[in-house]
Amino acid sequence: MGWLDFSSKSKKEEKDDTRPSFTWGDNLNATDWQHYTDPRTVIPTILLTTTILVSTRLYRSYLRRIPEAAYIRPGFFRKRSLFGTVTRVGDADNFHLFHTPGGRLAGWGWMPGRKKLPEGKDLKNKTIHVRIAGVDAPEGAHFGKPAQPFSAEALAWLREYIQNRRVRAYIYKRDQYDRVVATVWVRRFLVRKDVGKEMLRAGMATVYEAKMGAEFGDFEAQYRAIEEEAKKKKLGMWSGKKKDYESPRDYKTRTANAAKMLK
């Protein structure tokens, strides 16, 4: 009987020896690329990235608060509107707006941190100066110049109409005084009203007469028709004698020329 050779390897063991050997370091540093191409990983990643990009764009375009007119991007003009609260009416055809993008849906008026708007000195550098498009109100007393007739009445009218109210301004451009020229709408008794039209209707303003830079949106013809109606009814600034009437544009031209002559 022959001796069994225990030192010899079976064919299976010899075959196994041909497999490459791995170390623990290889296993720890190995990259499982299949994990990154697995639909269970790819699809959630794409959805999350898309959501972040869309949310960022939505915030920048519609929900980011604009503190002053200088911060309005050129691409916004004639394409976007500004919603906010009128904090101050300093003149009869312009006012200051605290921008509240998204309105109550974005938490303005009820959410902590947005429940109450700033007041007084806290509003400095936080409001947008808005010039109402298409109309010109009687000039108040400025820089030593006398006030025009009905300037006080026009200012009081505008304050009563929009002060502390939420308005929407459809913006056209920024003027030389860093004001935003806009058609402004306000809700009065649940009805949206064009503030410029209502000023003309009440005889508290004229149609803007400047030869250059006038902005009306699509309402110039309507504005002129409403002005003519107020003239016929002798409302507001049209109630005096025709010979005594001086338009805001003529007043500004006359006082500017007088100031030049004094230099």
UniProtKB/Swiss-Prot annotation:
Keywords: Calcium, Endonuclease, Hydrolase, Membrane, Metal-binding, Mitochondrion, Nuclease, Transmembrane, Transmembrane helix. The keyword DNA damage does not apply. It holds the Pfam family SNase. It is found in: Mitochondrion; Membrane. Residues 80-240 form the TNase-like domain. GO terms for cellular component: membrane; mitochondrion. The chain crosses the membrane at residues 41-59. GO terms for molecular function: endonuclease activity; metal ion binding. The active site is at residues 131, 139, 179. Its EC number is 3.1.-.-. Ca(2+) binds at residue 136. Residues 8-19, 241-253 have a biased composition (Basic and acidic residues). It is an enzyme of class 3 (hydrolase). This is Probable endonuclease lcl3. It comes from Botryotinia fuckeliana (strain B05.10) (Noble rot fungus). The gene is lcl3.
